[in-house]
Amino acid sequence: MNIMDFNVKKLAADAGTFLSRAVQFTEEKLGQAEKTELDAHLENLLSKAECTKIWTEKIMKQTEVLLQPNPNARIEEFVYEKLDRKAPSRINNPELLGQYMIDAGTEFGPGTAYGNALIKCGETQKRIGTADRELIQTSALNFLTPLRNFIEGDYKTIAKERKLLQNKRLDLDAAKTRLKKAKAAETKSSSEQELRITQSEFDRQAEITRLLLEGISSTHAHHLRCLNDFVEAQMTYYAQCYQYMLDLQKQLGSFPSNYLSNNNQTSGTPVPYALSNAIGPSAQASTGSLVITCPSNLNDLKESSNNRKARVLYDYDAANSTELSLLADEVITVFSVVGMDSDWLMGERGNQKGKVPITYLELLN
């Protein structure tokens, strides 16, 4: 029974305090009561903490979007994190693309130029997928986790103490108001005692809040180190991807797009990257087409009408019916035709005949 009486009294006291704060807050808003202002230093610290919280949240959320663009995947990871369980490993986009390329290359045949290239590209895409996974893991651990710890830990503590300071300030101003309204000596003495207590509690809470807020500078320093870790992780990722693509380009013998054949023109010749390097300064780009000084053995052929055997260096798909498609390593017969563009020869394979680009050929003795 005594416990029940105590609980009722406590509930009544809490209700009275809440009502007193509500009245004080309302009168302040209406301009009917004075408000104790916080000192400028404390106000600046509060503003700095609020600003830090807002921008930290924005940076954290956008970094999550950058690392995982799929919103469904982010929600799934969030749920598993709240359940304190590890999210199942899922294949990422580069890895999926890589697998499709490898499967396609296997289907087309690893022995064909296109199939072999697809397999090599697929393997590179898988390496990029692995690098992407490592970037996400490193960034989450070294950058996102510290930011989230601040939002969900340090700032929540600051917000709690700030709210408590606001309540102590309302209690203090309510006590000041009651003292002003007190007329009887006994009531005035009681109000003065209450004011001293509320002032002491307010000062104590202001000091606690100030000490917490001064830790924001340390938070900034910590987040700076985390930012450097994030930049280093990105630098490693992009350097890896660049190296993977550079290696792939070398494997494929890739060449710049302006060296590709123009299907709408017959005056230009596609030049493989490796061959253009071998030719060197003799290759010059002009008005979208490529003019090449032919190797001496091809010049000899142009000056004669004799047929010669030539080995095909690279696969070539005919752009139209006047051209002849080629397969790497096959041997065909070639000869010159009066009036034909200098970058082309006439090729013959059995009953098939058509123009072929000279840069795809190696004349045989």
From Swiss-Prot:
Region (Required for membrane binding): 1-37
Compartments where found: Cytoplasm; Golgi apparatus membrane; Mitochondrion outer membrane; Cytoplasmic vesicle, Autophagosome membrane
Residues in BAR domain copies: 27-261
Name of one Pfam family that matches: SH3_9
Tissue: Isoform 1 is widely expressed. Isoform 2 is brain-specific. Isoform 3 is predominantly expressed in testis, but it is also detected in liver and, at much lower levels, in skin, stomach and ovary.
Entry keywords, A to Z: Acetylation, Apoptosis, Coiled coil, Cytoplasm, Cytoplasmic vesicle, Golgi apparatus, Lipid-binding, Membrane, Mitochondrion, Mitochondrion outer membrane, Phosphoprotein, SH3 domain
Entry's Gene Ontology cellular component terms: autophagosome membrane; cytoplasmic vesicle; cytosol; endoplasmic reticulum; Golgi membrane; membrane; midbody; mitochondrial envelope
Quaternary structure (record): Homodimer, and heterodimer with SH3GLB2. Binds BAX; induction of apoptosis augments BAX binding. Binds DNM1, HTT, AMPH, BIN1 and ARFGAP1. Interacts with UVRAG; UVRAG bridges the interaction to BECN1 indicative for an association with the PI3K complex II (PI3KC3-C2). Isoform 3 interacts with PPP1CC; this interaction leads to the inhibition of phosphatase activity.
Protein name stated in the entry: Endophilin-B1
Species this protein is from: Mus musculus (Mouse)
Species lineage: Eukaryota, Metazoa, Chordata, Craniata, Vertebrata
Gene giving rise to this polypeptide: Sh3glb1
